[in-house]
């Protein structure tokens, strides 16, 4: 499928919208009331430091809603305002934050149901309004909705669209796209649908496995078993790893994406020589600025003397998980929570350890003066961060009184 031609056709359709409906000022006031925080504004103005009693808060200097998320949520709100009586669907969570998605449900935005792991679009009718989330949607979903005569509101983050352009460039010159990401993440599913031949690698370890196969060959069956869910139909590692281009899920760790790109570059130089590198390797910078800023801020924060870290964001949020990884790699006890409701009753916290299911920790807040690092993922409103801080302050005041 010529995905570029399809996008041009879709974008010129009168049923396609991605720039809002003229309700920006009204919606902006609504979003400020629902998601912004006066406390967080005060902490920012105070040099990202705050002390209450014997609790010192150190806030990362970049955290929370990014521009792409703000844009997506605002456009979803505008859609409801512009289509007050129409049936509105969304193909997936608008962002990975439970409170924001619940708010859309309260606004009568219906989520496409998933049956046996597959989205069921049978309930969508011609004339229905369908929102594409910030992560984007696969080209096949867009095609289905367009052919069904739906009004499509596209909130895809421009940084995600930039990655789509990169894999389309790979496809145009018959390069295989090596995508650093999670094969079952909505963004990577969408990105791979715009690629030609592709292989998805989760981390540097998997990238090394692939590069070793490029240099030395190996067990083809074992390779295919390892990447069975992470490659394009008909993928052949002996045929499809001769010319490769690098792309990434925008929320992955910046440093790891760069390492993977350099690893494949070195591998192709070793295999084919430096003079022929451009025949076998290409790479475009598709690392999201907002992701990079939040990771850089976290790397600065963990250099401070912190007793523990609280990372706030959806449990299925990739960028939030990577912020937690940074804390753990620097030896700081870290608690990943998705809302203030995870704290209490008493000195307990329900949190999600890295790559594990949620669990409960008792007596997580030490009974002494403490310094707590705070950050939040790109899908987390400031209001949620405020609620977490107030819960911590309330818990410490109760502990002090007792």
From Swiss-Prot:
Isopentenyl diphosphate binds at residues 96, 185, 317-319, 379. Binds 1 [4Fe-4S] cluster per subunit. Pfam families: LYTB. (2E)-4-hydroxy-3-methylbut-2-enyl diphosphate binds at residues 96, 185, 250, 317-319, 379. It is an enzyme of class 1 (oxidoreductase). CDD domains: lytB_ispH. [4Fe-4S] cluster binds at residues 66, 157, 288. It comes from the Bacteria. It catalyses: isopentenyl diphosphate + 2 oxidized [2Fe-2S]-[ferredoxin] + H2O = (2E)-4-hydroxy-3-methylbut-2-enyl diphosphate + 2 reduced [2Fe-2S]-[ferredoxin] + 2 H(+); dimethylallyl diphosphate + 2 oxidized [2Fe-2S]-[ferredoxin] + H2O = (2E)-4-hydroxy-3-methylbut-2-enyl diphosphate + 2 reduced [2Fe-2S]-[ferredoxin] + 2 H(+). Dimethylallyl diphosphate binds at residues 96, 185, 317-319, 379. Its EC number is 1.17.7.4. Belongs to the IspH family. This is 4-hydroxy-3-methylbut-2-enyl diphosphate reductase. The gene is ispH.
């Amino acid at each position: 499928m010529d995905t570029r031609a399809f996008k041009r056709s879709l974008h010129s359709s009168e049923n396609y919208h991605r720039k809002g409906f003229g309700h920006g000022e009204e919606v902006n006031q609504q979003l400020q009331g629902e998601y912004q925080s006066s406390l967080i504004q005060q902490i920012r103005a105070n040099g990202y430091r705050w002390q209450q009693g014997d609790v010192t808060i150190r806030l990362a200097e970049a955290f929370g809603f990014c521009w792409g998320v703000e844009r997506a949520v605002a456009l979803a709100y505008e859609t409801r305002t512009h289509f007050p009586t129409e049936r509105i669907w969304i193909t997936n969570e608008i962002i990975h934050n439970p409170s924001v998605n619940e708010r859309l449900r309260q606004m009568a935005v219906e989520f496409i149901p998933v049956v046996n792991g597959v989205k069921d679009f049978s309930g969508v009718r011609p004339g229905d309004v369908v929102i594409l989330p910030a992560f984007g949607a696969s080209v096949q979903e867009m095609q289905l909705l367009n052919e069904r005569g739906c009004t499509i509101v596209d909130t895809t983050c421009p940084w995600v669209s930039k990655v789509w352009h990169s894999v389309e460039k790979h496809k145009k010159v018959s390069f295989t796209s090596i995508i650093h990401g999670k094969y079952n993440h909505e963004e990577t599913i969408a990105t791979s649908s715009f690629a030609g031949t592709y292989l998805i690698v989760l981390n540097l370890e998997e990238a090394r496995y692939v590069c070793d196969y490029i240099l030395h060959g190996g067990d083809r069956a074992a390779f295919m078993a390892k990447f069975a869910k992470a490659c394009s139909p008909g993928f052949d590692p002996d045929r499809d790893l001769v010319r490769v281009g690098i792309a990434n899920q925008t929320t992955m760790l910046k440093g790891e994406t760069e390492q993977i790109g350099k690893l494949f570059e070195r591998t192709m130089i070793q295999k084919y020589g430096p003079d022929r590198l451009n025949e076998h390797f290409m790479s475009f910078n598709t690392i999201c600025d907002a992701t990079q800023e939040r990771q850089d801020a976290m790397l600065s924060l963990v250099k401070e003397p912190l007793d523990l870290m609280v990372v706030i964001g959806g449990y299925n949020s990739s960028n939030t998980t990577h912020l937690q990884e940074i804390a753990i790699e620097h030896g700081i006890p870290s608690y990943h929570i998705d809302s203030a409701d995870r704290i209490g009753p008493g000195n307990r916290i329900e949190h999600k350890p890295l790559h594990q299911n949620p669990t409960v920790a008792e007596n997580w807040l030490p009974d002494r003066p403490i310094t707590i690092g705070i950050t939040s993922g790109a899908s987390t409103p400031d209001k949620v961060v405020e609620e977490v801080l107030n819960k911590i302050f309330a818990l410490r005041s109760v502990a002090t009184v007792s």
